Amino acid sequence: MVDERDKIILDILSKDARTPFTEIAKILGISETAVRKRVKALEEKGIIEGYTIKINPKKLGYSLVTITGVDTRPEKLFEVAEKLKEFEFVRELYLSSGDHMIMAVIWAKDGEDLADIISNKIGKIDGVTKVCPAIILERLK
């Protein structure tokens, strides 16, 4: 299990994975070695699965980001999901129990690019029955 110190470490690293262990140690009032051991234990337990960065899609020329629901014929669900994983424009992919069977975060250069992605790429995958994009207006958190 994780204790309060571990939770604080996780909170700090989730906001900035590059936070120096010395800084975390000062916040917690423990040694850098203790922080290092705790982080290693969290990694070994699978609580920390990896480290990532936040990318600003607009700075790379992608003016549209969508959360897109994709529905499929039930027997094709996993095949469709595997195919979606192959597309570079699909930045995140989830199986869902909500309104749609699959949820994809998609980066598109503009409306024309998004239309092409929906109609000619996702919509043409065998088993896809519905594609429902929702354009993100602003990231709040």
UniProtKB/Swiss-Prot annotation:
PROSITE patterns linked: HTH_ASNC_1 (PS00519), HTH_ASNC_2 (PS50956)
Pfam families assigned: AsnC_trans_reg (PF01037), HTH_24 (PF13412)
HTH asnC-type domain location: 2-63
Statement: the UniProt record of this protein carries the keyword Repressor: yes
Top-level taxon in the UniProt lineage: Archaea
SUPFAM superfamilies referenced in this protein's UniProt entry, alphabetically: Dimeric alpha+beta barrel, Winged helix' DNA-binding domain
DNA-binding region, residue range(s): 21-40
Quaternary state and interactors: Homooctamer; tetramer of dimers.
Protein's name according to its UniProt entry: HTH-type transcriptional regulator LrpA
Organism: Pyrococcus abyssi (strain GE5 / Orsay)
